[in-house]
Amino acid sequence: MGKKDKRWVLQRKNDHYYNLAKRRNYRSRATYKLFQLNEKFNLIKERNVVVDLGCAPGGWLQAARDIVGEDGFIVGIDLQTVKPLPHDNIIAIKGDMTKEEILKQAKDLLPEKPDVIICDASPNISGVWDVDHVRSLELTTMALMTATKMLKKGGNFVVKVFQGDLFEKYVQLVSEYFDKAFTTKPRASRDESAEVYVIGKRFNGKKFDMNSKSPIVKLLDTKPVEEEITSPSLRKEISKEDSGLMIKRIKEMRSKKE
């Protein structure tokens, strides 16, 4: 085991929320993030219907179930298979949350439109700040788009976002679809993490506008460019140049979209 691996194991052993989750049979320390977010913003209530986007490994499914109780209902969606949980009011679907057939499958399972949509999903991490920020925004914007397709009017939304240049513009975008938008970092988030949670309270019923002039929406059109600049061959070249080329290309991409 290398020094980095040993350091990671030691850090986890000393992690309060990791140990707490393990003792209480929660699948992830992130379970406590949702508990803390809900305590502060009253997002989920007893008997609510909840959809969890990017639900693997199931920590937020467990937290949501503890809050809604046996009379609530939760559907999770993830590209990975999620090990079943011992509750008949939790169902996890394997699939892409942006695909209409997967959304239809989720809607068909729900007893009614969801009261709350939650998303703690993370993109694949490259280790390059600008790239990870763009990937995070692409993922969270797709989550917002999905929320506007599914939420009942007056419903709530919470999503994890990585901080960066366009973070405030994402918050502004969320505020177009909800009466109030908030940002917060729960106690269970690690101090060194760039993650922040964006909360939308009381969905106004407006459908997602793909023709919006928001630079965040425009990012959804940049996937081919992003794939190009993060390809293994270019990453190898970039690592020799201290990642400068990658950062330059992403900034060029942003300026064109703005």
From Swiss-Prot:
Entry annotated with the keyword Zinc: no
Keywords: Cytoplasm, Methyltransferase, rRNA processing, S-adenosyl-L-methionine, Transferase
Record-annotated active site: K160 (proton acceptor)
Domain of life: Archaea
Listed Pfam families: FtsJ
UniProt keyword annotation of S-adenosyl-L-methionine present: yes
GO CC annotation terms, alphabetical: cytoplasm
Top-level EC class as recorded in UniProt: transferase
Catalytic reaction(s) noted: uridine(2552) in 23S rRNA + S-adenosyl-L-methionine = 2'-O-methyluridine(2552) in 23S rRNA + S-adenosyl-L-homocysteine + H(+)
EC identifiers of the protein: 2.1.1.166
Location of this chain's protein in the cell: Cytoplasm
Residues at which S-adenosyl-L-methionine binds: G58, W60, D78, D96, D120
Recorded GO MF terms: rRNA (uridine-2'-O-)-methyltransferase activity
Cited function: Specifically methylates the uridine in position 2552 of 23S rRNA at the 2'-O position of the ribose in the fully assembled 50S ribosomal subunit.
Family from the record: Belongs to the class I-like SAM-binding methyltransferase superfamily. RNA methyltransferase RlmE family.
Protein name: Ribosomal RNA large subunit methyltransferase E
Species assigned in the record: Methanococcus maripaludis (strain DSM 14266 / JCM 13030 / NBRC 101832 / S2 / LL)
